[in-house]
Curated annotation (Swiss-Prot):
Mg(2+) binds at D102, N230. The keyword Membrane does not apply. This is Bifunctional protein GlmU. Homotrimer. Residues 233-253 are annotated as: Linker. Catalyzes the last two sequential reactions in the de novo biosynthetic pathway for UDP-N-acetylglucosamine (UDP-GlcNAc). The C-terminal domain catalyzes the transfer of acetyl group from acetyl coenzyme A to glucosamine-1-phosphate (GlcN-1-P) to produce N-acetylglucosamine-1-phosphate (GlcNAc-1-P), which is converted into UDP-GlcNAc by the transfer of uridine 5-monophosphate (from uridine 5-triphosphate), a reaction catalyzed by the N-terminal domain. Disulfide bonds: none annotated. The active site is at H366. Its main location: cytoplasm.
Length: 461
């Protein structure tokens, strides 16, 4: 079967009150359009056609790697007109599935069922299948009109509906599937004689009835699947639905969430056994948490891997890090891209790392900046230590070998190497390589000025 998917993404999204095209607004860390494309990909289609219009170049440049065929709708003349733009690129015998880029939570299982529905009960497969739903509040959506036999014979858009029609709870989701040959016959016949002066895709229902093409409907069990996004309130509502579903899936697999309503996933989260996640944590990109990991409140993890038994304390930010087993991080720590910790390491409060590689058992417990640095095993970094890695033009590396003890308030001016088991005295500025097994410090005499008087404030007149 040749399957062609059309995604409608040309709308302006006026009610978003934004310079950003609606389909680029993010839900769970990804643009709305990306959600729909990723769902479409799971159906293994022969092609995905994205109809773009308003802000089209911005959409294409923002999502250059989407595996889609871009189709331009120069004038936004309605959904039927939008689908028509893609038809020259689609074979007559293909099945066409029409989706909307602002309906991001449609499930692949539902779409598979709809495609199957479009192939039933007719030898030549010439069936029009519609995805419908029963909603308590159908305001703004097209209503399904059925005859006395329960057969669909029309869809009436909200702006064209009278009060009797508006009371109908069954709505059309905007998702349909049929043969391309049907659409190629029906779409050129569309009229814009309606309240919005647009060419509605829903008018193809009347042509299907005239041609005696069977119309089948599939009712989704989950109303969120067909909820569209037209304003920021609806975006927030679907965000919470997505997050609640993600939280439930994690808890079903054994993850403990302190509060599922205060959890945010903006990518992929893979957890081992007995993982605990406290409130207000944000996971972005791909995050892997090993067995027994604990994440404290108000933490942000982006593209991070934690080994077994790690604990991240409150208010810590980790990005682009790989952490081995039994490490302790935070509170108030910042681990930037390129940080790697071997097992049993500790990064304490107000420590920032960047491109820092720690070997086993190394600790930096307080108030330090460690950038572009290699640290050996069992190194102790005192409070206030800074690797001075930038000369104004280039970055330079610091190497700290096994067993080094660095006293508090030390500056290591890179490039510099500290030999194994060396000790650096507190308050030192190290500009040259330090020999192993020795005490190195930079000393300035302590001086007392006797009889010195602290300046006193003058009284104002």
């Amino acid at each position: 079967m040749n399957l062609q998917i059309i995604i409608l993404a040309a709308g302006q999204g006026k009610r978003m009150y934004s310079d950003t095209p609606k389909v680029l607004h993010h839900l769970a860390g990804k643009p709305l359009l990306t959600h729909v494309v990723e769902t479409a990909q799971q159906l293994n289609p022969d092609a995905i056609h994205v109809i773009y219009g308003h802000g089209g170049e911005q959409i294409k440049s923002s999502l250059p790697n989407l595996p889609v065929h871009w189709v331009h709708q120069a004038e936004q003349l309605g959904t039927g007109h939008a689908v028509l733009q893609a038809m020259p690129h689609i074979p007559d015998d293909a099945y066409v599935l029409v989706l909307s880029a602002d309906v991001p939570l449609i499930q692949v299982e539902t779409l598979q069922s709809l495609i199957e529905c479009s192939q039933r009960q007719n030898p030549d497969h010439s069936v029009l299948a519609l995805l419908v739903a029963e909603l308590e509040n159908p305001s703004g959506l097209g209503r399904i009109i059925r005859n006395n036999q329960g057969e669909i014979y029309s869809i009436v858009e909200e702006k064209d509906a009278n009060e009797q029609v508006k009371n109908i709870k069954e709505i059309y989701s905007g998702v349909c599937c049929t043969l391309a040959n049907n659409l190629k016959k029906w779409l050129p016949q569309l009229s814009n004689s309606n309240a919005q002066g647009e060419y509605y895709l829903t008018e193809i229902i009347s042509f299907a009835v005239q041609n005696k093409t069977p119309i089948r409907s599939l009712t989704t069990k989950n109303s969120f699947e067909v909820q569209g996004i037209n304003n920021r309130q609806q975006l927030q509502q679907l965000e919470r639905i997505w997050q609640q579903r993600a939280a439930n899936q994690l808890m079903e697999k054994g993850v403990t969430l302190a509060d599922a309503n205060r959890f945010d996933l903006r990518g992929e989260l893979y957890c081992g056994k007995d993982v605990y996640i406290d409130i207000n944590c944000i996971f972005t990109g791909k995050v892997v948490l090993g067995n027994g990991c604990k994440i404290g409140p108000n933490c942000s993890l982006t593209n991070v891997t934690l080994g077994d038994g790690c604990e991240v304390y409150a208010n810590s930010v980790l990005e682009g890090c790989h952490i081995a087993n039994d490490c302790h991080i935070g509170p108030f720590a910042r681990l930037r891209s390129g940080t790697q910790l071997a097992s049993h390491c500790k990064i304490g409060n107000f420590v920032e790392t960047k491109k820092a590689i720690f070997d086993e058992g190394t600790k930096a417990s307080h108030l330090s900046y460690l950038g572009d640095v290699l640290l050996g095993k069992n190194v102790n970094v005192g409070a206030g230590t800074i690797t001075c890695n930038y000369d104004g033009v280039n970055k330079h590396q610091t190497i700290i070998e096994d067993g080094v003890f660095i006293g508090s308030d030390t500056q290591l001016v890179a490039p510099v190497t500290v030999g194994a088991n060396a000790t650096i005295g507190a308050g030192s500025t190290i500009r040259r390589n330090v020999p192993p097994d020795e005490l190195t410090l930079t000393e300035s005499r302590q001086k007392t000025i006797y009889g010195w008087k602290r300046p006193a404030k003058r009284e104002r007149d």
